[in-house]
Design a protein with these regions (language model features):
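C-terminal peripheral helix-coil segments that are non-catalytic and often amphipathic
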Residues: 154-216
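Short hydrophobic clusters on alpha-helical segments that form packing/core surfaces
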Residues: 11-19, 57, 61, 86, ...
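A contiguous pocket-lining binding segment that forms or flanks enzyme active sites
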Residues: 115-152, 156
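Alpha-helical DNA-contacting segments of helix-turn-helix folds
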Residues: 19, 54-61, 104, 109, ...
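Helix-turn-helix
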Residues: 10, 14, 18-52, 56
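Amphipathic alpha-helical interaction segments
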Residues: 52, 81, 95, 112, ...
Length: 216
């Protein structure tokens, strides 16, 4: 039985999988052809040379990361949902996001999330500089949190670690704090608490009726 004709989308799907697993350096035309079980000339026919392939992957990544749909009954909860979705996207596509950044398209990549945040800021009664503050603050929190998460994941074992550094003296006589800091960090819990506090602060100036309850 003849193999179905290869499509451009299949080439891009396979290329994206290789980049996600091994990084951009692992993406070669020969390797991609071998992955797809086709000739190198077929890859060139569908996507051009390697630079054209990388450009196509970046364009697709920008489009995919634009699909953020806020959820929740209040602006506060919908803003928090945008933050969670953006963090998840950045966490799930580190190599592809890095490629977007290297090609100078970072701001374009963030535009859909920013527009979603603007709509929710307006829904909460914030406009102008206050709405812009919502956009910037949420974006910076998400990006900063993701960078810290990745840094901790890649960092060598710390000696001394937090458990050794925190004691009765360094914790200002707070044994419950010492016990809490001795436990492994839960990035999801830290992120949720950070977003909740940030959104509550940002919406303080919003009309009470538009603000809604705190994000959960």
């Amino acid at each position: 039985m003849a193999r179905p004709a290869l499509t451009r989308d299949e080439v891009l799907d396979s290329a994206a999988d290789l980049v996600k697993q091994h990084g951009p350096a692992a993406l070669t035309m020969r390797g991609l052809a071998a992955e797809l079980g086709t000739a190198v000339t077929s890859i060139y026919w569908h996507v051009g040379n390697r630079e054209s392939l990388l450009d196509a992957l970046v364009e697709r990544t920008v489009a995919d990361l634009g699909e953020i749909r806020p959820v929740g009954r209040t602006p506060a909860r919908r803003i928090a949902s945008v933050a969670r979705a953006l963090r998840r996207q950045l966490r799930d596509h580190p190599h592809l996001v890095a490629m977007v950044h290297e090609r100078g398209l970072t701001e374009r990549m963030f535009l859909p999330a920013q527009q979603a945040l603007v709509r929710e800021a307006h829904a909460a009664g914030l406009r102008g500089a206050r709405a812009a503050e919502v956009v910037r603050a949420v974006q910076f929190l998400v990006v900063g949190h993701v960078l810290v998460e990745r840094n901790r994941e890649r960092a060598p074992a710390q000696r001394p670690g937090e458990q050794e550094l925190w004691g009765a003296r360094t914790a200002d006589g707070d044994p419950a704090l010492v016990r809490a800091l001795a436990r492994p960090i839960d990035p999801e819990k830290v992120f949720t608490a950070s977003v909740k506090a940030l959104v509550a602060g940002l919406l303080e100036a919003a009309p009470e009726t538009a603000r809604g309850p705190d994000p959960s």
